[in-house]
Amino acid sequence: MGLFFDDKENVFQPTDFRLVGLHRTAAYILGVDPAEEAPKLALSDETRLIAEKYVCIAVQASTQCKYWNNPTGWMEIVAYLKKQGYRVICIDQRPVHGTAIVWNHIPYGAEDQTGNRPLTERARWLRHAEFFIGLSSGLAWLAWAAGTPVVMISGFTHPINEFYTPYRNINWHTCNSCWNDERERFDHHDFLWCPRHANTPRQFECTRLITSQQVIAKISAAIHALS
């Protein structure tokens, strides 16, 4: 899969990947059907890791604009899930991640299954989870492949960027979708990249203004669909 940020003349891609989504751009390059289809996983061990019902979460990301920047969001979600009788399993690579003066921690109350572990282990956790709650990140794609319902929290990407999930959270009343804006060039070296509102009170408002109540509504819909 090729992501060509500066291909203004469409030499390497017939349409800009930001307009068609990460998982469709290769299809456009190859000239095949761009309809999305989750890959099928064949795990050598398909057994459950714990007997109780549980939810997987992943809160970390490679850049701050991907995070859910609501300061109390994850804490409130974990508390809500535990009240519903779920164990909450965090399957990030790291329990803490960030840069300079900005660091993001595993939410209080979540069980720590972070670490440099095989993706097959992550997939096994996801396969038996009631659902997954996470960001526009690799573990969300792995959950999709595992056949697990995904509650996604993302504001810096437009929904076209990822696979479809009925449980996506985005706030259309704030700045949003800068990643999919051809006018903005993502800076892989700026962890605090926010092209429209950097160093202003509006920085990262795309996810900061996604409320826990909004996410809980999507979680409730996922729970209802499972019942």
Residue ranges and their predicted role:
Residues 1-227:
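Catalytic machinery of carbohydrate-active enzymes
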